[in-house]
Every structure is written in C-alpha cells, then in structure tokens.
Amino acid sequence: MGEVALKYRLMPESPDSDTSAIVDSISGVLPEDASLGAHEIKPFAFGLNAIIIVIMGIDREGFATEVEDALNGLTNVQTVVLEEQSLV
C-alpha cells in the first residue's frame, strides 16, 4: 500500500470564524493513520477566507470518506470540498 495526499478546501461559517482555531482542531479529529500536512488560508469572497489543507495517509479503502466525515464535524466549518487526491 502506498500513501495518498488529499487536498481539501474548508469554508468557515462566517468571516468572523477563527481560521487559526479551525486549523488547530483538525489534527484532533482525523483518523489515527492520517496526518495534517501543509495548510494555507486564502481570501475567497465577501470577506471569507478558505482554509486549504493537505491530509496525508495510507491509501486504503474508506480513508477519504473517514477524513471527510471528520472534517465535516469540525465546529465553525460550513463546507468541506475534496479538491485533489493523488498517490505519493
């Protein structure tokens, strides 16, 4: 089995959401075999900032679904979009 990199765009609920706190909480909700790689906060629209993250983990069945479910459970996150998926 190889490793997979998943690139997500997380959209906070409002422009007032603390994006740093959201990033800090990500590692705590991920499956055991997943880790937070790079992250970046980018202006999106109407004062909202998108959080772009890369999650690394083992390429196994159900991995992306588990990660996405965990990210959807984060406080102050409105949407989670998988933008890219690739083997490393």
Q: Language-model features: where?
A:
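Long, contiguous binding/interaction regions
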Residues: 1-88
